[in-house]
Structure formats: C-alpha cells, structure tokens
Amino acid sequence: MKPRLIQTFLPDGSLEGIKVVELSESSVKAFVVPRIKLNELRKRQEINQPSLYLLINSADNQLYIGESENFFHRVKNHDQSKDFWDLAIAIVSNTNSLEKSDIKYLESLAVEKAQKTAAMTVLNRTIPARNNVHEFKVHTLEKMLEDIAILTGGTLIAEE
C-alpha cells in the first residue's frame, strides 16, 4: 500500500459535530453526521447529489447501506422511519460526477463486501442487484469502494 493523506474538516469546530473527510488522490469524500446534527447538514450543497450512505448504530455495531439521489432528503426520511441509527455517513463525488447507476453499483458492492467481512452486523436483508454500468467504469467504481473503506476507517466496509 502507498501512503495516503486523510484530511478532516470540522465545520463547527467541534469533534461532536459534522465531519467532512477527504482522501488524497480520491474522487469521493465522506460526510460523517451524528443524528442529532442532521439539520445542520441542510447548509451543505454537496449532499444534494447521488450518494452512497451508511446508517450506523454505534452501540450495537450495526450497519445499513443505502443509496440516494439526494442524501439530505433520504436521511430525513430515515430519521422518522428507522430508529436504530445514531450516525450517518454520506459518500459523495468531489466533482458531482456519479450517476444513479454508479451509486447503485457501489451500493451492491458495499453490501456484498460488508456482509463478507463481518466488521459490523449488516441490516440489509439482501444484496441489491448489481446494476449494469459501462465496463470502463467498473475499475473506477471498485477503486472508489477501496477509498470508501479508508474514509470510513476500514471498520465499516473492512478490508478482506
């Protein structure tokens, strides 16, 4: 493995608030959002694009993986319909270049990998169908998933 730089930005200056995490030479970044800070996320334009997201129950080591065209709207729905989680992580493109089919493909890869590695109890009942993406994109999306594993500390979608 080669050296990588991870940068974390604290928009409100607090470790208990939202964190924006970027990885050198990566086309994705992560928004780490405590459930109690959801409304503060409304100010961030980047989360209004297609995203892969993780809902996490820190106490019980549980994980739900999903995809959305607009993370903020989706997570607000989950705020009312899913009680188990206390932390959300949204993975978005730095260039707003991910399409719905790309995100669905990433979701399928992420659920499959998370279920295999058993880093956390995965609450997804099934592995989403692997969406058809252009063969030129497959390598890029698999590389993104490797970056996502690093951005999430390797514990959510762990290395095999």
Each predicted region: which residue ranges?
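Boundary/linker segments flanking structured domains
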Residues: 1-50, 58, 71-160
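GIY-YIG nuclease signature motif recognition
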Residues: 53-55, 62-69
